[in-house]
Amino acid sequence: MTASRDPYPSRIVCLTEETTETLYLLGQEHRIVGISGFTVRPPRARREKPRVSAFTSAKLDRIVELEPDLVLGFSDLQADIAAELVRRGIEVHVFNQRSVGEILRVIRTLGGLVGCERAARALADTLESGLAEIASAARGLPRRPRVYFEEWDVPQISCIRWVSELIGIAGGDDVFPELAREPLGKDRILADGLEAARRRPDVVFGSWCGKKFSPRAVAARPGWQDVPAVRDGELHEVKSSIILQPGPAALTDGVRELHRIIGEWVQRHA
């Protein structure tokens, strides 16, 4: 009797890190034939898989040479890449998760795409439980700091929805909740950079999309000298790889780092 052929995609290219990390966590890394050059999680992925894309660009000919039966992308920023690959006859699935709930749904969906629905549900449930534990601990904090999270410095861009939600889970309050609902970065640009100072954040998180955050530069901005976060030295970098990647990293290391810093702020200001 001949063994049945695996009916699921066996040559997957991941254009962003979160799908790579998720497939590794599901034990499905053998299906991956190409990854993003920005991938750092898990570290061994960079050693094991060829890097075929940046974030808004890709080595299209190289991807075609890999003969993928599925390419996984993310958001409108990769729409042009996806369209060109489709024109070349390649199947593409583009996720568009912007919230914590949508990140969990993507994990479950990805499990279905590769035939490991049960493992994916278990992973998502574990991540959800971890978030609930942090939220429970945060509810016990005597104070909640006002938090400004900056994704980019020039122009100043405030945080996307999943980051805003994770700030809330971790024990803080995003000072720009109305902007967090905007899915596109261009719609989260602060028309007046001083508005962030006027909202008087107690804590500033900087995660400049791979560029090193400079607390000194933020503190030196005109009009910022009386901001509580500047006055108290509460300007903190959070690595982009653990918070701006809408996948397992943000729901584990990212939110834990936010919670740790917020907890330390509470201790200093109790």
Where are these regions (language model features)?
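N-terminal ligand-binding lobe of clamshell/alpha-beta domains
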Residues: 1-270
